[in-house]
Amino acid sequence: MHETRIVVGPAPFSVGEEYSWLAARDEDGAVVTFTGKVRNHNLGDSVKALTLEHYPGMTEKALAEIVAKARSRWPLGRVTVIHRVGELWPGDEIVFVGVTSAHRSSAFDAGQFIMDYLKTRAPFWKREATPEGDRWVEARDSDQQLAKRW
């Protein structure tokens, strides 16, 4: 049985609880997770806060499509994608991606694929608060290059 959890919202999440849910399937020998956090700097400037916005409904649909594409490429068990929105502070967790599979190679590849596609294809917008004022975060070419490998 394949299970997917996709959550987009302002609430914090527990990495431990998410891992426990993923690891509960005895059929899977591999659990791979990634947790992204707000950094206190970007582009050489101090970052005081990060505001994430999304397009409700469209964002969840895009994430579901990314997970479906990963499932079509690798034999996966459970998949979790959580992305926070709203105002966050340095050190806060932003995103969690977790995947399970019978073997590590599929789990690692699928986790990277989901994260690379999330960064380039899911409709999220970031605004940083810096000492010099607020600014929108532009898409990075390096993220596009990583997504192209798939």
From Swiss-Prot:
<keyword id="KW-0501">Molybdenum cofactor biosynthesis</keyword>
<feature type="binding site">
    <location>
        <position position="119"/>
    </location>
    <ligand>
        <name>substrate</name>
    </ligand>
</feature>
<comment type="pathway">
    <text>Cofactor biosynthesis; molybdopterin biosynthesis.</text>
</comment>
<keyword id="KW-0808">Transferase</keyword>
<dbReference type="InterPro" id="IPR036563">
    <property type="entry name" value="MoaE_sf"/>
</dbReference>
<feature type="binding site">
    <location>
        <begin position="126"/>
        <end position="128"/>
    </location>
    <ligand>
        <name>substrate</name>
    </ligand>
</feature>
<comment type="subunit">
    <text>Heterotetramer of 2 MoaD subunits and 2 MoaE subunits. Also stable as homodimer. The enzyme changes between these two forms during catalysis.</text>
</comment>
<feature type="binding site">
    <location>
        <begin position="103"/>
        <end position="104"/>
    </location>
    <ligand>
        <name>substrate</name>
    </ligand>
</feature>
<comment type="similarity">
    <text>Belongs to the MoaE family.</text>
</comment>
<dbReference type="Pfam" id="PF02391">
    <property type="entry name" value="MoaE"/>
</dbReference>
<comment type="function">
    <text>Converts molybdopterin precursor Z into molybdopterin. This requires the incorporation of two sulfur atoms into precursor Z to generate a dithiolene group. The sulfur is provided by MoaD.</text>
</comment>
<dbReference type="GO" id="GO:0030366">
    <property type="term" value="F:molybdopterin synthase activity"/>
</dbReference>
<dbReference type="GO" id="GO:0005829">
    <property type="term" value="C:cytosol"/>
</dbReference>
<dbReference type="InterPro" id="IPR003448">
    <property type="entry name" value="Mopterin_biosynth_MoaE"/>
</dbReference>
<dbReference type="GO" id="GO:0006777">
    <property type="term" value="P:Mo-molybdopterin cofactor biosynthetic process"/>
</dbReference>
<protein>
    <recommendedName>
        <fullName>Molybdopterin synthase catalytic subunit</fullName>
        <ecNumber>2.8.1.12</ecNumber>
    </recommendedName>
</protein>
<feature type="binding site">
    <location>
        <begin position="37"/>
        <end position="39"/>
    </location>
    <ligand>
        <name>substrate</name>
    </ligand>
</feature>
